[in-house]
A protein has these predicted regions:
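Structural micro-motif
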Residues: 83-92
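N-terminal leader/targeting and pre-domain segments
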Residues: 17-34, 119-125
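Short active-site neighborhood of thiol/selenol oxidoreductases, capturing the structured segment around
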Residues: 32-44
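Typically the conserved alpha-helix immediately C-terminal to a functionally engaged Cys/Sec
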Residues: 50-62
Length: 125
């Protein structure tokens, strides 16, 4: 019985986790902001966050030197509060001085996301 319960818990956890591939998950306070980068902020059980995961994974695979992080607001609620994040998903764009230069709230398609990454100097082609 114990094995069945543990197995079911693992299955449920897998269903509600996003696959961002090799995009590291970090708390905002742990991210070294010394170069242009993007932080995708989402949370568990967020349909729009989940639908963006494959696109961000593809971008990271196509442009491996592009710095992208994922922050789960469920795991870093202080990071979300301290950065005035009230709606999800949100993409935060930082310059090399560590200053937030832009944010996009809501779902964004791959083509538009690539344009944001280019505009704010995050995309490394």
């Amino acid at each position: 019985m114990k094995k069945i319960v543990i197995s079911l818990m693992l299955i449920v956890a897998t269903l509600f986790s996003h696959d961002f591939g090799n995009v590291p998950e970090k708390k905002l306070s742990q991210i070294k902001k010394d170069r242009p980068l993007m932080v995708m902020v989402g949370k568990t059980k967020c349909i729009w966050c989940d639908s963006m995961a494959p696109q961000i994974k593809e971008i990271k695979e196509q442009y491996p030197k592009t710095v992208i992080y994922y922050m789960n607001a469920d795991k870093d609620p202080l990071g979300a509060i301290n950065n005035n994040i009230v709606e999800l998903p949100v993409q935060l764009f930082y310059n090399k001085e560590g200053k937030e230069v832009a944010r996009h709230v809501g779902y964004i398609g791959k083509k538009d996301l690539l344009e944001y990454l280019r505009t704010y100097g995050v995309l490394v082609e």
